[in-house]
UniProtKB/Swiss-Prot annotation:
Associates with the 50S ribosomal subunit. GTP 1 binds at residues 36-43, 83-87, 145-148. GO terms for biological process: ribosome biogenesis. Residues 377-459 form the KH-like domain. PANTHER family: GTPASE DER. GTP 2 binds at residues 209-216, 256-260, 321-324. This is GTPase Der. Residues 30-193, 203-376 form the EngA-type G domain. NCBIfam families: GTPase_EngA, PRK03003.1, small_GTP. The gene is der. GTPase that plays an essential role in the late steps of ribosome biogenesis.
Length: 469
C-alpha cells in the first residue's frame, strides 16, 4: 500500500463505473387507444405495431383487463399505444369494470382505433361503441381484423355500415394491412419532436406481491381514481400498468403488476406470461413496494418474491397491508414476529398500512425516498478505504489455508445498488463478507437498499485483471 492507504496499482484494479443513468424521457407523445370487444385481436395488433411481444395474448375473451400503455415508433414518429380491456356496453361484473377502463381510454386518447372481427361482422356492441366514439369528437379509425386473404376483403367491406368511414382490412396476426393503417392514423396525430429531454423523469416504483394482496387497491388509493381494475378475484390485474401519480410534491411512475403465482412453472397460459412480465417490471423499477398480507402468516411465496427483488438489486419497501384486520392487542406481537422472520433484511424499509382505509399510506413516500437515497449513495474512495482499514485492524479476515487474506484496496464500482469491490490477497469467506456488510450499514446507512460486495483476488504480484471470486 502507498502512504495514503491505497493500492499502488489502483488504475489496474479499479472497475469502470457502469452506465446506470436513465435514458432521458421522450417528449410527450400523442396517445393512440386500441379498443374493441373481447378477443377481437387488440393485443395482437398492439404487438404488431410495437414489433415485439408486450401485451398478453391468449385465445380467451377478457385476457387484457387494464389499460396498458407502450411507447411506439413508426417511420420516425413517436407515439403511445394504449391497449384496453374488451369493450362491452352492457357488461356485468368484471367486464363492466373493463368497459369503464376502455371508456376512459377513449376520453384521454388523441385518436382511437376500433377493432372489429371481420369474420363475425358488426355486432350490437360494435355498433354501440361506434356511436359513442363518433360523439367523442376524436379521430376514429375502423380496423377490420382477421382479413387473412383477398377473398376475405368482402367481409371488411360490409363494415362501411358502421358509419366510421373506410374499414381498414388488416390481419394483426400476419401483419397484412397494418402498415397502411398506421400511415393513415399518424396523419391525424400531432408531430412528435425527436429530441430527447435531458431530465431524468419520475422515479419508477413496482408494486408486487401475491394475488389479491391489495396492489390495485393501493394504487387506486394513491391515485384517487379507478386507474387499475379492482375486483374480488385473485389475479385480476394481468398486465403491468404504468400510472403517473403526484405524491409528496413529486411525480412517481407506479407499475401495478400481476401477482406472482405460487410457482411460475406451474402457471398456465396468460398467468405464466404475466408472471414473467412481473419479473420484468421488477427489473424496470428503481424501488419495489412488496405488499404482504398482515392478516395471514408470512408464506414461502412472500419470501421467494422478496428474494427475487433483492437479487434484482432494487430498493425495497415492505408494506404490510390489511393492518386494519389485525387485532390491536396483537399488533405489537406481530411486529416482533416480523422482525424475527426477516432478521436477515432488517435494513428494508417497512410500513404497516391499509390500502382499503388509507391507514398510514402516507408513510410510503418517505420510506421510498429513504430507500432510493440509499440506493443512489456513493462512498468516496478515500473515506471507504479509511473505514476498511479500521474495520480490518479491529477484526481481521479469518485464516484460510494457513494464510490470512489481506484487503489491499476497496472501491465502490457502482450505485443502484451500491456495489463494492475489494481487492485482496486471498478469498474472503461469506461470513466475513456479511460482517463487512453489517459494518457498512452501521457506518453509512443504506437503509432500504441491498448492497453487494465483490472480491477480486490478486493471485500473484503483477496480475492486472484477477478473476472474480
Amino acid at each position: 500500500m502507498t502512504q495514503d492507504g491505497t493500492w499502488s496499482d489502483e488504475s489496474d484494479w479499479e472497475l469502470d463505473d457502469a452506465d446506470l443513468a436513465d435514458l432521458a424521457e421522450a417528449a410527450p407523445a400523442p396517445v393512440l387507444a386500441i379498443v374493441g370487444r373481447p378477443n377481437v385481436g387488440k393485443s395482437t395488433l398492439v404487438n404488431r405495431i410495437l414489433g415485439r411481444r408486450e401485451a398478453v395474448v391468449q385465445d380467451i375473451p377478457g385476457v387484457t383487463r387494464d389499460r396498458v400503455s407502450y411507447d411506439a415508433l413508426w417511420n420516425g414518429r413517436r407515439f403511445v399505444v394504449q391497449d384496453t380491456g374488451g369493450w362491452e356496453p352492457d357488461a356485468k361484473g368484471l367486464q363492466q369494470l373493463v368497459a369503464e377502463q376502455a371508456s376512459v381510454a377513449m376520453r384521454t386518447a388523441d385518436a382511437v382505433v376500433l377493432v372489429v372481427d371481420a369474420t363475425v361482422g358488426a355486432t350490437t356492441a360494435d355498433e354501440a361503441a361506434a356511436r359513442i366514439l363518433l360523439r367523442s369528437g376524436k379521430p376514429v379509425f375502423l380496423a377490420a381484423n382477421k382479413v387473412d386473404s383477398d377473398k376475405a376483403e368482402a367481409d371488411a367491406a360490409t363494415l362501411w355500415s358502421m358509419g366510421l368511414g373506410e374499414p381498414h382490412a388488416i390481419s394483426a396476426m400476419h401483419g397484412r394491412g397494418v402498415a397502411n393503417l398506421l400511415d393513415t392514423v399518424l396523419k391525424k396525430l400531432p408531430e412528435v419532436a425527436e429530441s430527447v429531454s435531458a431530465g431524468g423523469g419520475p422515479r419508477r416504483v413496482a408494486l408486487v406481491g401475491k394475488p389479491n394482496v391489495g396492489k390495485s387497491s393501493l394504487l387506486n388509493k394513491l391515485a384517487g381514481d379507478e386507474r387499475s381494475v379492482v375486483h374480488d378475484v385473485a389475479g385480476t390485474t394481468v398486465d403491468p400498468v404504468d400510472s403517473l401519480i403526484e405524491l409528496g410534491g413529486k411525480v412517481w411512475r407506479f407499475v401495478d403488476t400481476a401477482g406472482l403465482r405460487r410457482k411460475v412453472g406451474q402457471a398456465s397460459g396468460h398467468e405464466f406470461y404475466a408472471s414473467v412480465r412481473t419479473r420484468g417490471a421488477i427489473d424496470a423499477a428503481e424501488v419495489v413496494v412488496l405488499l404482504i398480507d398482515a392478516s395471514q402468516p408470512l408464506t414461502e411465496q412472500d419470501l421467494r418474491v422478496l428474494s427475487m427483488v433483492i437479487e434484482a438489486g432494487r430498493a425495497v419497501v415492505l408494506a404490510y397491508n390489511k393492518w386494519d384486520l389485525v387485532d390491536e392487542d396483537r399488533r405489537d406481537l406481530l411486529d416482533r414476529e416480523i422482525d424475527r422472520e426477516l432478521v436477515q433484511i432488517r435494513w428494508a424499509q417497512r410500513v404497516n398500512i391499509s390500502a382499503k382505509t388509507g391507514r398510514a399510506v402516507q408513510k410510503l413516500v418517505p420510506a421510498m425516498e429513504t430507500a432510493l437515497a440509499s440506493w443512489d449513495t456513493r462512498i468516496p474512495t478515500g473515506p471507504l478505504n479509511s473505514w476498511i482499514k479500521e474495520v480490518v485492524a479491529a477484526t481481521p479476515p479469518p485464516v484460510r489455508g494457513g494464510k490470512q487474506p489481506r484487503i489491499l484496496f476497496a472501491t465502490q464500482a457502482t450505485a443502484r445498488p451500491p456495489t463494492f469491490v475489494l481487492f485482496t490477497t486471498g478469498f474472503l469467506e461469506a461470513g466475513y463478507r456479511r460482517f463487512l456488510e453489517r459494518r457498512l450499514r452501521e457506518t453509512f446507512g443504506f437503509e432500504g437498499s441491498p448492497i453487494r460486495i465483490n472480491v477480486r483476488v490478486r493471485e500473484k504480484r503483477g496480475a492486472k485483471r484477477p478473476g472474480r471470486r
